[in-house]
């Protein structure tokens, strides 16, 4: 058998140098590592990796070329109680592979065994890694670097956003190419979006349970190869990387940033009954948080938790993030269940991965957004992330819904959330933009469903409606489901307008869920993670042009208000904000806590948001000055109105003087 040259211990992964390929793999507890390469006929050829530098195994294969398919067999102890689950009968994915050939199907051969090892060889059906070469012309691409204070985030799914768009060519709908199509870019520009936040695009697998039910993982929060693009979103798997970069380059030319939702908290190997794809067989003890009995700490709800305090795993995660920035020019990340990033195992702001990101000249310069919780004790960490991070602000989400849909939130609590939740985020030198304000997200009801359903309707997910949260703070306005009388439709529309206005004219960084701006419904499903169908795909033919125009007008209005774009905390007397009652007087302490839900918010001394969240039409006395309603609450040409606004029940209006 041909022997490999020793090669180099860095960088991790498979790298072509023009003459051959250098292979490197981390494993602190392996006793032997075999590189397995497959020829055009599928014949397997095995080579021991001869180099062993610290915990890095490496070797160099002369004359190997891009397109070569490979995997690893890793030898070591099978000692489940100690956290070791080596099984050389199983072909393993390189954690740093840039492309994968094959599908991650539910098959007993892709399991290592629970208590006893399964020594049946699986190379015939296991997915293979592919060696790639990177040559791409970025031309004059430059990151937009939109200031945080001017950032408007649009959360979208690659397929769901584009698959049904009638003006995008059929052959590219649902793909990376569609994201860069002029029709999509023009839509985002007209809406006023500055950052497109994509649900996971790194390669993921559908859980075996879903496959057995005929479903699939649609959202993508089940990663299997963090350096590889999910091939189902590409017109051709071989060109996925260039298709993705073409889209990013086109978006950048339009001034739109691209933020990736990335999953560093767990892997698709799930619990001990889950499949064996990669990390579990390479070095289970190092990659995962292991309990004393050898099982996993399940702090993610997905069966396992990556140990992001282990030095090698920190290096792996950091290299992954740098890859997406340096190779694909992404502008930032949203981190799923990001409290795991700070676990040591207790949560710490100076956890190793946070420190590595802070000290990295590449990663410290991009937008970083945390979903600031996990499901373990002490996992709720909203407001506690390091200064470089912004965070999803669930306080804002719940407050906005309670104020407009449940009518049970005092004015003081509403104002606190409107002012970027300063009680939560104004610390450690952080700015208002650290609060990522949202009313909806991929996880939960859509905006339309918030006003049409009191209860979740997740039966299609196959769990007898047990999955998904029951704490929705929604209001169906008297009838469960879509449709209804003209009066019902109008009341729901008014609530949608109120929630959108609160989101887009409050301090902090707004995030809009794709489809909310044109009335997309998931028919009451608030956990549509496994619905790759018309329930989740945006139906552009049914889009409400009126609601889209309303949303766009709000976004463009936001950009005109200095108090919202200057990204500095509001202080009493600084001219940024004044809080007034229905008589244009400062609110008393009692009004803040117990007063009627009527409020006037004067921003930058020129823009006035008048709110009447009561059940009755109410006269609102505006502050001194000549006020006129402005779009989207009135047409462009409006006469100066009187000093009093007749506020409709559960209504609001924006004025300018």
Swiss-Prot record:
Q: Which InterPro entries match?
A: GlgX_C, GlgX_Isoamylase_N_E_set, Glyco_hydro_13_cat_dom, Glyco_hydro_13_N, Glyco_hydro_b, Glycogen_debranch_bac, Glycogen_debranch_GlgX, Glycoside_hydrolase_SF
The pathway to which it is assigned is: Glycan degradation; glycogen degradation
Q: Name a single GO biological process.
A: glycogen catabolic process
The EC designation for this entry is: 3.2.1.196
* Region listing for Disordered, in residue ranges: 458-479
Give the enzyme's main class according to its UniProt record, as a single word.
Answer: hydrolase
**Site residues, Transition state stabilizer:** 443
> What's its catalytic activity?
Hydrolysis of (1->6)-alpha-D-glucosidic linkages to branches with degrees of polymerization of three or four glucose residues in limit dextrin
* Composition skew (Basic and acidic residues), residue ranges: 458-467
Q: Which CDD domains match?
A: AmyAc_Glg_debranch, E_set_GDE_Isoamylase_N
Q: What GO MF annotations does this protein's record show?
A: glycogen debranching enzyme activity; hydrolase activity, hydrolyzing O-glycosyl compounds
List, alphabetically, the NCBIfam families matched.
glgX_debranch, PRK03705.1
Q: So what does this one do?
A: Removes maltotriose and maltotetraose chains that are attached by 1,6-alpha-linkage to the limit dextrin main chain, generating a debranched limit dextrin.
Query: Can you tell me which family this protein belongs to?
Result: Belongs to the glycosyl hydrolase 13 family.
Q: What name does the UniProt record give this protein?
A: Glycogen debranching enzyme
- From what organism does this protein derive? Escherichia coli (strain SE11)
Upper taxonomic lineage: Bacteria, Pseudomonadati, Pseudomonadota, Gammaproteobacteria, Enterobacterales
């Amino acid at each position: 058998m041909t022997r490999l040259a020793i090669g180099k211990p860095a960088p991790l992964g498979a790298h072509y140098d023009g003459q051959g390929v250098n292979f490197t793999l981390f494993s602190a507890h392996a006793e032997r590592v075999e590189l397995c390469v497959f020829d055009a006929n599928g014949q397997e050829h095995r080579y021991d990796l001869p180099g062993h530098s610290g915990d890095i195994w490496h070797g160099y294969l002369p004359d190997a070329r891009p397109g070569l398919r490979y995997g690893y067999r890793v030898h070591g102890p099978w000692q489940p109680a100690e956290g070791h689950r080596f099984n050389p009968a199983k072909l393993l994915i390189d954690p740093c592979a840039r492309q994968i050939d094959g599908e991650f199907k539910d098959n007993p051969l892709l399991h290592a065994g629970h208590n006893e090892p399964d020594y049946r060889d699986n190379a015939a059906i296991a997915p293979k890694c592919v060696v790639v070469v990177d040559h791409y012309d970025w031309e004059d691409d430059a990151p937009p670097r939109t200031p945080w204070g001017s950032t408007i985030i649009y959360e979208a799914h690659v397929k769901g956003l584009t698959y049904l768009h009638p003006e995008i060519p059929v052959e590219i709908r649902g793909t990376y190419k569609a994201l860069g199509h002029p029709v999509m870019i023009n839509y985002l520009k007209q809406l006023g979006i500055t950052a497109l936040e994509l649900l996971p695009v790194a390669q993921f697998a559908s859980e075996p349970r879903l496959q057995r039910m005929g479903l699939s993982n649609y959202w993508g929060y089940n990663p299997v190869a963090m350096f590889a693009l999910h091939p189902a979103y590409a017109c051709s798997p071989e060109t996925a990387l260039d298709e993705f970069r073409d889209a990013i380059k086109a978006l950048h030319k339009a001034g739109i940033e691209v933020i990736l939702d990335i999953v560093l908290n767990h892997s698709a190997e799930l619990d001990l009954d889950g499949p064996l794809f990669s990390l579990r067989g390479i070095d289970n003890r190092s990659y995962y948080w292991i309990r004393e009995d050898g099982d996993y700490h399940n702090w993610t709800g997905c069966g396992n938790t990556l140990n992001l305090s282990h030095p090698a795993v920190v290096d792996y995660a950091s290299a992954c993030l740098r890859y997406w920035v340096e190779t694909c020019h992404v502008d930032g990340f949203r981190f799923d269940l990001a409290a795991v990033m700070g676990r040591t195992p207790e949560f710490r702001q100076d956890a190793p991965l946070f420190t590595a990101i802070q000290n990295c000249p590449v990663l410290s310069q991009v937008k970083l957004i945390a979903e600031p919780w996990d499901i373990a004790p002490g996992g709720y960490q909203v407001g506690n992330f390091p200064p470089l991070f912004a965070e999803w602000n669930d306080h804002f989400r719940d407050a906005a819904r309670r104020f407009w849909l449940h009518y049970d939130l005092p004015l003081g609590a509403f104002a606190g959330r409107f002012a970027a939740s300063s009680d939560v985020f104004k610390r450690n030198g952080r700015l208002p933009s650290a609060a990522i304000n949202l009313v909806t997200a991929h996880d939960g009801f859509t905006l339309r469903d918030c006003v049409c359903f009191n209860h979740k309707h997740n039966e299609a997910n196959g769990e007898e409606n047990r999955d998904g949260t029951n704490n929705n703070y929604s209001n169906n306005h008297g009838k469960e489901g879509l449709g209804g009388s003209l009066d019902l439709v109008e009341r729901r529309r008014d609530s949608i307008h109120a929630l959108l206005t609160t989101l887009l004219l409050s301090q902090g960084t707004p995030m809009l869920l794709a489809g909310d701006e044109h009335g997309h419904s998931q028919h009451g499903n608030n956990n549509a993670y496994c619905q790759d169908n018309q329930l989740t795909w945006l139906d552009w033919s049914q889009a409400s042009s009126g609601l889209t125009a309303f949303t766009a007008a709000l976004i463009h209005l936001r950009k005109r208000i200095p108090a919202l774009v200057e990204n500095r905390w509001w202080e009493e007397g600084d001219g940024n904000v004044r809080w007034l009652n229905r008589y244009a007087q400062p609110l008393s302490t009692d009004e803040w806590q117990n007063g009627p839900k009527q409020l006037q918010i004067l921003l930058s001394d020129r823009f006035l948001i008048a709110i009447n969240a009561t059940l009755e039409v109410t006269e609102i006395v505006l502050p001194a000055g000549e006020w006129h309603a402005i779009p989207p609450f009135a047409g462009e040409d409006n006469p100066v109105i009187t000093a009093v606004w007749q506020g409709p029940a559960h209504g609001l209006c924006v004025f300018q003087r």
